[in-house]
Amino acid sequence: MTNNEKVINNKKSTDSSKLFRYQAKFVAGAMNINQIPNFLLPEIAFIGKSNVGKSSLINTICNNKNLAKVSNIPGRTGQINFFNLADKLIIVDLPGYGFANVPISVKEQWEVLISYYLRNSNNLRLVNLLIDSRRGIKENDKKVAELLLKNKRSFQIIFTKFDKVTDCKNLTDEAQNFLTTLHYSCNVMYVSSRSKEGARELKASLAKCIIKPQRSKGR
């Protein structure tokens, strides 16, 4: 039994994960709020610190290593990228936060863009808050979680690069303590883009968003 199976109450991945057998494609990039599209499809977003492995994880669950551009240089996702999966789901890659080596004005522009999207998207069903397993939860991760709760956004915690650590107990304890301070409960998952551990369970959790009701507030 994997760690992820324990976290999600030992439920097996459902056939809904077959959704990710379809080919996802890049459909839009938004560098400012006026460029944010409305596809009238459920959206799932990925957010995390620069170099946390967002693009690699998106490529892993979509079985396409060239879908989202991967770079070892933090801060290379400078816009919101939208990927269409079988006209059933939109995967949203948000700019990384934290130590990106970009001018302050650019960072502020990204913050405005991300905040606007999180506040106004009526199609957003779930946000995946990515945390580097080697680093643990940092102060800026906490601020993002608070922003999500402020905007009444459902989210789950995804520990990335799990192949680089030997034990998840400390991470699990850290996550549960963190969630307790937020008075929030959610899935906590462990995923490796390299070994593919946890990818199947993650796909299943994302596919469920297709039937999840939309928020009343619209974009």
Swiss-Prot record:
Disulfide bonds: none annotated. InterPro entries: G_ENGB_dom, GTP-bd, GTP-bd_ribosome_bio_YsxC, P-loop_NTPase. Keywords: Cell cycle, Cell division, GTP-binding, Magnesium, Metal-binding, Nucleotide-binding, Septation. Its cofactor is Mg(2+). It comes from the Bacteria. Pfam families: MMR_HSR1. Mg(2+) binds at S55, T77. GO terms for biological process: division septum assembly. One of its GO terms (molecular function) is GTP binding. GTP binds at residues 48-55, 75-79, 93-96, 160-163, 191-193. Residues 40-212 form the EngB-type G domain. Necessary for normal cell division and for the maintenance of normal septation. Belongs to the TRAFAC class TrmE-Era-EngA-EngB-Septin-like GTPase superfamily. EngB GTPase family. This is Probable GTP-binding protein EngB. It comes from Rickettsia canadensis (strain McKiel).
